[in-house]
Amino acid sequence: MRLVVCLVFLASFALVCQGQVYKGGYTRPVPRPPPFVRPLPGGPIGPYNGCPVSCRGISFSQARSCCSRLGRCCHVGKGYSG
């Protein structure tokens, strides 16, 4: 009985040492792709069209409207894209 246990242990140890059991290896986490940034239309955007030059101090609905109508999208902590 001891001989069988010893042989099984040695066989499994040999397979592990040769890399036959763990072929996958270490896989690192897949990095998240950068968020999609739409191109800015030409020229600065001013108050005349309802979208201020800065993202600061505008409401969520106004920011969403500027993003959908003109492609000027605000990102948290970064201001307008582009």
UniProtKB/Swiss-Prot annotation:
Disulfide bonds join 51-66, 55-73, 67-74. The keyword Disulfide bond applies. Belongs to the penaeidin family. Its main location: cytoplasm. GO terms for biological process: defense response to bacterium; defense response to fungus; killing of cells of another organism. Higher expression in hemocytes and to a lesser extent in heart, testis, gills, intestine, lymphoid organ and hepatopancreas. Traces in eyes and subcuticular epithelium. Not present in the brain. It is found in: Cytoplasmic granule. GO terms for cellular component: cytoplasm. The modification Serine amide is found at residue 81. It comes from the Eukaryota. Keywords: Amidation, Antibiotic, Antimicrobial, Chitin-binding, Disulfide bond, Fungicide, Pyrrolidone carboxylic acid, Signal. This is Penaeidin-3b. One of its GO terms (molecular function) is chitin binding. Residues 1-19 form the signal peptide. The keyword Metal-binding does not apply. The modification Pyrrolidone carboxylic acid is found at residue 20. Antibacterial activity against M.luteus and E.coli bacteria. Antifungal activity against N.crassa and F.oxysporum. Presents chitin-binding activity.
